[in-house]
Amino acid sequence: MSGWWIGLIVVLAAIAGWGVWLMVGRNRVVFGEVEILNPDGGAGTALVVYHPGKSDFQRRVFAGFAEGLVAGGWRVELTTPSPLTPTGLDGVDLLVLGGPTYGFKPNRPIQAYLNRLGDLGAKPTVTIITALGMGQRSTRIMEQLVRRANGTLVKALVLYKARPNDEDNPVGGSQNQDLAVEIATRAAKTIDLAAL
């Protein structure tokens, strides 16, 4: 076999390995503790479950959303979707689900967690999808999954790491990511349990 063919096989194997890492490695379950913010919050209890992905963007967005809820007086339970994540929603007034999109779909751990929850019993639910630049399809899928599980969709956000989050005033790089966090925080501040 010539060196050219061997080189081609090595390149194709590397591309295949990278593809497997993208789809499997990024979709792996991350075990996280339940972090309780504002334990005495009287506005209601929100369970925020998100897949952290491979960068800190998801963590920042969901921390911003949690911060907005806390500013509104909510008790927030923040965690990741794993087999250990609580599935009992008694005492939970608002469910927040999301994380990164991979392969134009919501990440597998959040889909599996939503499956484990079963019937949401009309629970008010917010979805937050993060993406590099194309998250609309993933957001639609997440909305459908919540509705199919008998959840009441309160809000669906899609926030971008690279694509401008404000088409009228585009900013790039870290400014765009900071804007995504700010949008998440503002969105959380508008959620009023009495109006749900």
Locations of the language-model features?
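Short connector loops at secondary-structure junctions
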Residues: P83-L84, R163
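Short amphipathic alpha-helix with an adjacent loop that forms part of the alpha/beta core around
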Residues: L84-D90
